[in-house]
Amino acid sequence: ASDTLKSWNLLPTKPDWAQGLAKTWAPGEAGARELLATFLDDGLKGYAEGRDRPDQQHVSRLSAHLHWGEISPHHVWYATRNAMARAEGVLDRDGEKFLKEVLWREFAYHLLHHVPHFPDKPFKPEYEDFPWVVDSEALQKWQRGQTGYPIVDAGMRELWATGIMHN
């Protein structure tokens, strides 16, 4: 028999955290294209600096759509390039930074495909003897956004509430 979801003691169970997902997600290709268009119109300008600021919305939120194939990296690439061209240089720095992040994502997929041990072993052998700390209580606090580190906890709570974590 397998575990029940209730036995995992996930938080929060009340209120219904899935309500947040329903408010923030529009699954499918149409939702992905709409999200990309909104990002290119409203979020790309300022991306290079704002992507690392959780108090700003300069993130695309496209990761799940890319993961599930609801939009392709090629589509994102060309739509971003077109937005940059229309802006006549105004978005060049931000667009280039965003495209570099898309390329990093694709590079990671390339590594996962072509380096069979990548998910299970360190990429660099000198890290094989890294002294990992096994602490199930600390792991549970991290998973629930209860570490006591505000930026870490905010990120995990955002993930719980919206299904997305800021950059």
Question: Language-model features: where?
Answer:
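Glycine/tryptophan-enriched, flexible segments
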Residues: 1-122, 126
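Poly-acidic low-complexity segments
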Residues: 28, 72, 135-136, 149
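Residue-level signal for pocket-adjacent positions within structured domains
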Residues: 57, 61, 134-137, 159
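Short, functional "switch" segments adjacent to catalytic/cofactor/reactive centers
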Residues: 105, 121-146
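C-terminal substrate/ligand-recognition segments
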Residues: 109, 114, 137-167
